[in-house]
Amino acid sequence: MIRGAVYPVDLGDAKRGHEQRGRRLGLVISIEQNAWSTVTIIPTSTSAQPAVFRPDVVIAGRDTRILIDQIRTIDTAYVTGELVDCLSRDDMAQVEYSLSRYLGLLRLQRSMGSSL
């Protein structure tokens, strides 16, 4: 799997909580050198509510929100189809910034100063 690539994924049929479920597109954010049978993805939605941690991008010609708050690691068996699209560098930078902000890594980086 390629970081920044978008694939169809099946997130199952969980009936509780607010987790995304069912078949949808997922953005791969794990590194390419990951030799495990899992991949870390961020689900996408064309109808989710906007939020500062849900960047808007265009995937396969459709306006799409990247649901940073729904990040998860799945078995590669749940990747159900072929490559749909790849995000541009600018779009990936926007996703990475939103992810860092959502996880509080920007504050951590600032508090550690230049020691990173």
What does each of the following model-derived ranges do?
Residues 1-116:
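Conserved functional hotspots at enzyme active or ligand-binding sites that engage polyanionic ligands
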